[in-house]
Regions:
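Glycine-rich phosphate-binding active-site loops on the catalytic face of alpha/beta enzymes
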Residues: 82-94, 180, 237-248, 297-298, ...
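A gly/proline- and charged-residue-enriched helix-loop-helix capping module
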Residues: 87-137
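Active-site glycine- and acidic-residue-rich loops that bind
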Residues: 146-159, 187, 213-232
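An N-cap/entry alpha-helix motif that binds or orients negatively charged groups
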Residues: 2-49, 113-118, 122-123
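C-terminal helical cap(s) of enzyme catalytic domains, especially alpha/beta-barrels
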Residues: 93-109, 249-264, 320-345
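Catalytic cores of alpha/beta
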Residues: 69-76, 219-233, 284, 298-315
Length: 357
């Protein structure tokens, strides 16, 4: 009923608004979820997931980008997530790229954004989170400040400054964003620069926070190999595979409209195959102790199941919420639970029989 209400009433109203205005409106009213008796949740024993030593009630998390500044950490459990990731957080507060910078592609269940890492800055976010009550295990995504003069050694210093601000917070993990396409200098994709950052981070990581590296689905084979090798040298917990893509291949949206929108990272349903391929490749290269959080094009329980079978331990989504609303995560978890049970029956029927007797 609520799902139908969202798709027939709420979504059409939001889609008449500028995408960024709609996003801000949702943020304005989201804190009211704390006072609502409604929880959009589905629980099942076979959904419990271990991520870096934490037991999650389910493997479906909120991707970075929705709660950039940590304003909603006490209500995100109401949407049925097993964990959440806030950010990206940068050392300095920035306004991001000029508007318009967020665009819907309804024919593709996709979004193009070139927000440019707008946010309150690390100090403000850290102060807010120090006083906050986390409703879910919560990770934090760190990115380089989007300013043209922050490059090279300054980029390393910038990222470490953010880590210094947040390293004492009760976080589930920290992710380093090596894959944002909407900033000056693009991504932190130089091997030596990434190596320097990870080495210094682990020196400062006295609390032993699990460290993940967020990778682009557009990464070359060499970059994928470099990142995995660096992660192993410095004891990284794992990888987030992946982020938005610069590719526009296979879209249903009119090509003239896509060209009119211009640059930006594409997220949503068209990203799935690229994210799956990245997940499979990293799964081949990583250490058995390292874990993958998959991100990109996940909108159904079947999608989630495919990523888990590709080597992911947990999953993230964001764009699908825009199109399917607050009941989405519960539906994904319900479908995923059924698929996992069916697989167990198919592969281990004797175990099922013994547990049922």
């Amino acid at each position: 009923m609520i799902e139908g209400m969202y798709e027939k009433l709420v979504r059409p109203a939001l889609f008449k608004m500028d995408p960024e205005q709609a996003h801000n409106l949702v943020h304005k009213f989201a804190p009211l979820l704390a006072y609502s008796p409604i929880r959009f949740q589905f629980t099942a024993a076979n959904l419990q997931t271990n991520l870096s030593g934490l037991v999650l009630k389910n493997p479906v998390g909120l991707a970075a980008g929705f709660d950039k500044n940590g304003n909603l950490v006490k209500v995100l459990d109401r949407l049925g997530f097993g964990f959440a990731e806030i950010g990206s957080v940068c050392a300095e507060a920035t306004s991001g790229n000029p508007r318009p910078r967020l665009f819907r592609l309804p024919s593709d269940n996709a979004v193009i954004n070139r927000l440019g890492l707008n946010g309150d800055g690390a100090e403000a976010v850290a102060q807010r989170l120090a006083k906050a009550k986390f409703a879910l295990p919560t990770g934090l995504n760190i990115a380089k400040t989007n300013l043209p003069d922050i490059q090279g050694d300054k980029a390393v210093e910038d990222v470490l400054k953010t880590f210094d601000q947040i390293k004492s917070l009760p976080l589930a993990y920290v992710a380093f964003n090596a894959s944002c396409p909407n900033t000056h200098e693009g991504i932190l994709n130089e091997r030596q620069q990434l190596n320097d950052i990870m080495a210094e981070v682990q020196k400062k990581n006295v609390a032993g926070l699990p460290i993940f590296i967020k990778m682009s689905p557009d990464s070359t084979e060499q970059l994928i190999t470099d990142i995995v090798e660096i992660s192993q040298v410095h004891g990284m917990a794992g990888f987030i595979c992946g982020n938005t893509t610069l590719s526009r291949d296979g879209l249903n949206t009119d090509s003239a409209r896509v060209a009119q929108i211009g640059m930006g990272g594409l997220s949503g349903q068209p990203l799935k195959s690229k994210a799956l391929n990245l997940c499979r490749r990293v799964a081949q290269l990583k250490l058995p102790t390292q874990q993958i959080i998959a991100c990109g094009g996940i909108a159904t329980g079947r999608d989630a199941f495919e990523f888990l079978r590709a080597g992911a331990a947990a999953l993230q989504l964001y764009t699908a919420l825009v199109y399917h609303g607050p009941t989405l995560v519960a539906r994904i978890n319900q479908e995923l639970s059924v698929l996992l049970q069916q697989e167990l029956v198919r592969t281990e029927p004797q175990l099922i029989s013994e547990n049922s007797s």
